Design a protein with these regions (language model features):
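Thiamine diphosphate
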Residues: 1-102, 107-108, 113-114
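A glycine-rich phosphate-binding loop feature that marks nucleotide/adenosyl-phosphate handling sites
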Residues: 6-7, 55, 82, 141-155
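Short glycine/threonine-rich loop-to-helix capping motif typified by GTGT followed
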Residues: 12-17, 150-161
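Short basic, glycine-rich beta-strand/loop surfaces that mediate nucleic-acid
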Residues: 68, 127, 156-158
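Residue-level detector of conserved catalytic or cofactor/ligand-binding positions
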Residues: 187-196
Length: 196
């Protein structure tokens, strides 16, 4: 990601969790932030990039690359007020149409919106599940109020969440599988071996 108010804290928090295998990159601009996430997705990672309204404009071409490449990518848009650079510390929920239609070629993309600080985990989990299982980028909308808010939150039991089952290429497919090969039930398969 590239630091942009009010989304920067997500990058800061994720950077604290390298011991859990989280990899973070602070890029030189919004375009590089999304393009590097697309590269990570192409390499088989669950990729996430964070931004706010003006950054989504800059990321749109790379987001479309993930659409056409059928790559799992989560784009977190922490919305802020106003057009253009806007008001970075003012909370608004004004990027819904941008999230739904803000790309050329009418490329579709699922959109999920978090409703509160306590709902963010569930919304992020579902965004990742949809991205990985359906090989598509997903936009996760939140806003400055939610991003800067806090609430009592009970750590969830992950066993109670629906399993995430990405369509990996299996070892028995080696030699007779191509990245553009269609699957009868879905679009394409993740072209790396399933993690062990």
């Amino acid at each position: 990601s590239y630091p942009i108010t009010p989304a920067t804290d997500i990058l800061h928090e994720l950077a604290k969790h390298k011991s859990l295998g989280v990899k973070t990159v602070q890029c030189e601009d919004e375009i590089a932030g999304c393009a590097s996430a697309v590269g990570a997705a192409f390499a088989g990672a669950l990729a996430v990039t964070t931004t706010s309204g003006p950054g989504v404009c800059l990321k749109s071409e790379a987001m479309n690359l993930a659409v056409i490449g059928e790559l799992p990518l989560v784009i977190v848009n922490v919305q802020r007020g106003g057009p253009s650079t806007g008001l970075p510390t003012k909370s608004e929920q004004t990027d819904l149409l941008q999230a739904l239609y803000g790309r050329n070629g009418e490329s579709p993309m699922p959109v999920i919106a978090a409703t509160s600080p306590t709902n963010c985990f569930d919304a992020a989990y579902m965004a990742c599940k949809i991205a990985l299982e359906h090989m598509t980028p997903v936009v996760l909308l939140t806003d400055a109020f939610v991003a800067n808010g806090s609430a009592a939150w009970k750590l969830p039991n992950l066993n109670e969440y629906p399993a995430i089952n990405p369509p990996y290429v299996t070892p028995d497919m080696a030699g007779n599988w191509t990245p553009y090969q269609r699957n009868e039930e879905t679009l394409s398969l993740i072209h790396i071996s399933e993690p062990t």
